[in-house]
Regions:
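Conserved, compact domain cores that house catalytic/ligand-binding motifs in diverse enzymes
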Residues: 140-215
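Divalent metal-coordination and catalytic microenvironments
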Residues: 53, 102, 149, 172, ...
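Extended active-site neighborhood of metal-dependent phosphoesterases/phosphodiesterases
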Residues: 106-133, 186-283, 312-318, 324, ...
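Bacterial N-terminal signal peptides
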Residues: 5-15
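Short, well-ordered beta-to-alpha junction loops that form the rim of enzyme active sites
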Residues: 107-108, 250, 297-301, 329
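Acidic, histidine-bearing metal-coordination/catalytic regions of metal-dependent phosphoesterases
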Residues: 2, 19-146, 166, 361-386
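Active-site neighborhood of phospho(di)ester-bond hydrolases with catalytic His/Asp-centered motifs
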Residues: 145-148, 171-177, 204-212, 295-299, ...
Length: 386
């Protein structure tokens, strides 16, 4: 009996030792990451916000946030049950309240070595507190600003930033062609995001509309990682006060089988999926019918290259009662009013390359003011509620 008890005790000893070992603390070193870019906000909605920032060393990320100045809530991403460890950090805030101002602080904790057991960690780097305000389709007014076709010209971006009334602007829309093509992450920040965020800061959201040049270059396939949305795509809708915004991706300006693409483009099926989404959205989303104004934001005013032409897109926009389409691409201003002679029932405004468009909408009127970087008024447009 005694022998049996001794054998059982010895048998349980490794398990007890293992249990104690598992609770041993992991090592924390006196080193912390540096936040190199951001934080910035992408396409904030009524109940969601996407916060992005970057660090110089691999880290885990979280966001402390809350209504007003409260930062008691914590959002920490997970992918397949694992906390992401890297230098790019994306945190989605969900179940927010419309039209509410939130405070937030981003936290990055360095991961020194990702061992299988007891990974080595470091200290925190923080940025904040910052704040943002969610959109609200019930608000009686909204003001936002649009620019386009900056094409890696950082001096152009600086002039546009100076021409924007940031105090009155709730969010910034970039209508595409921020690049000639995209080679690297370094270029993406140097030529576009960094100078753009110098105006936006961490408190106002960026709404990005993909242009045809954003489909080009070795880093084009990574662009969505830097302007992510909860939808995980470049087309979606948002409600901003009395305006129902529909963001579309007009793809490329040439056919997929053009040799310059070397058979690496498949925009035809992509655009077919997008058109199916648009048709379903305008047919089923109540805000399309209820909103005082419906506005489409896209890059190419002719809807981009389409095998069967733009007919189905124009027809869908007409049937949905779209009031205004705003685009870029041509590098010069133009305006086409609705009418049977032009085949569309919406106003079409094409923004020039060195111009700023300011949209101010109430429940009764949508007004667009286009100015040059020198402040000179190029065009004003007033659209009454139908």
């Amino acid at each position: 009996m005694i022998r049996r008890a001794l054998l059982l005790a010895f048998a349980l000893l490794p398990a007890a030792t293992s249990a104690r070992a598992q609770s041993e603390p992991f090592r924390v070193f006196d080193t912390r990451p540096v936040i190199t870019e951001g934080p910035y906000l992408v396409a904030t909605g009524e109940t969601t916000a996407t916060i992005v920032w970057f660090t110089d060393t691999p880290s885990q990320a979280k966001v402390l946030y809350g209504a007003g100045g409260d930062l008691s809530e914590i959002a920490e991403p997970q992918v397949d049950g694992l906390v992401p460890v890297g230098t790019r950090h994306v945190v989605q805030l969900e179940s927010l309240s419309p039209g509410t101002t939130y405070g937030y602080e981003v936290v990055a904790t360095r991961v020194v070595k990702l061992n299988a057991y007891w990974p080595d960690k470091g200290l925190d780097a923080r940025s904040g507190p910052h704040r943002f305000t969610t959109l609200d389709g019930r608000n009686p007014s909204v003001s936002f600003t649009l620019i386009t076709d900056t094409h890696e010209d950082t001096e152009r971006i600086r002039r546009l930033n100076q021409a924007i009334d940031w105090e009155a602007t709730e969010f910034l829309v970039h209508l595409g062609d921020a690049f000639d093509w995209i080679d690297t992450e370094e270029q993406l920040f140097r030529a576009w995001l960094r100078p753009t965020l110098a105006g936006l800061g961490p408190d106002k959201p960026l709404v990005f509309v993909r242009g045809n040049h954003e489909l080009r270059g070795p880093f084009a396939r990574r662009l969505r990682d830097y302007v992510p949305t909860p939808e995980g795509r470049f087309y979606y809708a948002r409600d901003a006060g009395p305006v129902h915004l529909i963001v579309l991706d007009t793809g490329e300006d040439k056919a997929d089988d053009t040799n310059v693409y070397a058979e690496l483009n498949r925009t035809s099926p992509y655009r077919a999926d997008e058109l199916a989404w648009l048709k379903e959205h305008v047919a089923t989303d109540a805000r399309v019918a209820e909103a005082p104004f419906r506005v489409i934001l896209m890059h190419q005013p002719d809807w981009g290259w389409l095998q069967d032409g733009p007919g189905p897109w124009v027809e869908t926009a007409n049937e949905a009662g779209i009031d205004l389409v705003m685009a870029g691409h041509r590098h010069r201003f133009s305006y086409t009013p609705p009418g049977p002679d032009v085949g569309h029932l919406y106003h079409l405004l094409v923004l020039g390359q060195d111009q700023v468009a300011r949209v101010d909408a109430t429940t009764e009127e949508l007004r667009v003011t286009v100015t040059g970087v020198d402040g000179e008024v190029v065009h004003t447009l007033s659209i009454p509620r139908r």
